[in-house]
Curated annotation (Swiss-Prot):
GO molecular function, one term: proton-transporting ATP synthase activity, rotational mechanism
Matches recorded under NCBIfam families: PRK03957.1
Assembly with partners or alone: Has multiple subunits with at least A(3), B(3), C, D, E, F, H, I and proteolipid K(x).
Major localisation: membrane
Organism name: Thermococcus sibiricus (strain DSM 12597 / MM 739)
InterPro entries: ATPase_V1-cplx_f_g_su (IPR008218), ATPase_V1-cplx_fsu_bac/arc (IPR022944), ATPase_V1_fsu_sf (IPR036906)
Family note: Belongs to the V-ATPase F subunit family.
Pfam families (alphabetical): ATP-synt_F
HAMAP family xrefs: ATP_synth_F_arch
Protein name: A-type ATP synthase subunit F
Topology term for the membrane: Peripheral membrane protein
Amino acid sequence: MKIVVLGDKDTVLGFRLAGVHETYSFEDTTHEIERVRNKIMELIEREDVGVILITERLAQRVEIPDVAFPIILQIPDKYGSLYGEEQLREIVRRAIGVEIKR
């Protein structure tokens, strides 16, 4: 199963350097947001994609489909996290039924 990253060019570059082979960079424009939506739908249909990582700022601009597979996770970009810690807690709570607290 492949990991695919969607985000700004700097975040995508970091993941490429870490060994992720399939990455897509997008600018924060209206035209690009439509391309992001199309790319997400295309990736969901592919059987070889197991995880889609998308930057939080990009995810705020598009509606992320609620699908069981592939797993879609929001990640911080070069500016830091918007709300990633809370989202991770919610994912764990839904997956295993345990709430993580500090």
